[in-house]
Amino acid sequence: MARIAGINIPDHKHAVIALTAIYGIGRTRAKAICAATAIAEDAKIKELSEAQIDTLREEVAKYTVEGDLRREVSMNIKRLMDLGCYRGLRHRRSLPLRGQRTKTNARTRKGPRKPIKK
C-alpha cells in the first residue's frame, strides 16, 4: 500500500479512485493531479513505480488536505460562532444553516426526538 499525505492508498484501485481516499481530494482534483503527474487515470496504484508515487506525493502536497483541511474547516465554523452571526448561531444550536424548514424536517441536524416531559 502506498502512503500519501499520511493515508494508506488502496493499491488495487485505479489512481483517480484511490486518490479520493484522501480527505479534500475528490474526483475532479484527482483527475487534475493525474494529469499534472502524467499518470494514466486507469493505472492501478500497485502498477506505479516508486518514482511515480513520489511525484503523486509532491503534487498532493500542493493542496490543503487531511488534518490541515479539517482544522481549517473547524476554525471557520468556530469563527462564525464567535462572531455571533446568523450562521454561527445556527451552528451553535445544531440547526440547519441554509434556510431549510425545521418544523417537521431537519432530524439529521437536530438529532433524535426529545420526548415532552410531563
Curated annotation (Swiss-Prot):
CC annotations in GO: cytosol; small ribosomal subunit
Swiss-Prot/TrEMBL GO biological process terms: translation
Assembly and binders: Part of the 30S ribosomal subunit. Forms a loose heterodimer with protein S19. Forms two bridges to the 50S subunit in the 70S ribosome.
Family as reported in the entry's similarity comment: Belongs to the universal ribosomal protein uS13 family.
UniProtKB keywords: Ribonucleoprotein, Ribosomal protein, RNA-binding, rRNA-binding, tRNA-binding
Segments forming a coiled coil: none
InterPro entries xrefs: Rbsml_uS13_C, Ribosomal_uS13, Ribosomal_uS13-like_H2TH, Ribosomal_uS13_bac-type, Ribosomal_uS13_CS
Top-level taxon in the UniProt lineage: Bacteria
Organism encoding this protein: Shewanella amazonensis (strain ATCC BAA-1098 / SB2B)
GO molecular function annotation: rRNA binding; structural constituent of ribosome; tRNA binding
A Pfam family annotated for this UniProt entry: Ribosomal_S13
Role of this protein: Located at the top of the head of the 30S subunit, it contacts several helices of the 16S rRNA. In the 70S ribosome it contacts the 23S rRNA (bridge B1a) and protein L5 of the 50S subunit (bridge B1b), connecting the 2 subunits; these bridges are implicated in subunit movement. Contacts the tRNAs in the A and P-sites.
The encoding gene: rpsM
Sequence segments annotated as region (Disordered): 94-118
Protein name from the UniProt record: Small ribosomal subunit protein uS13
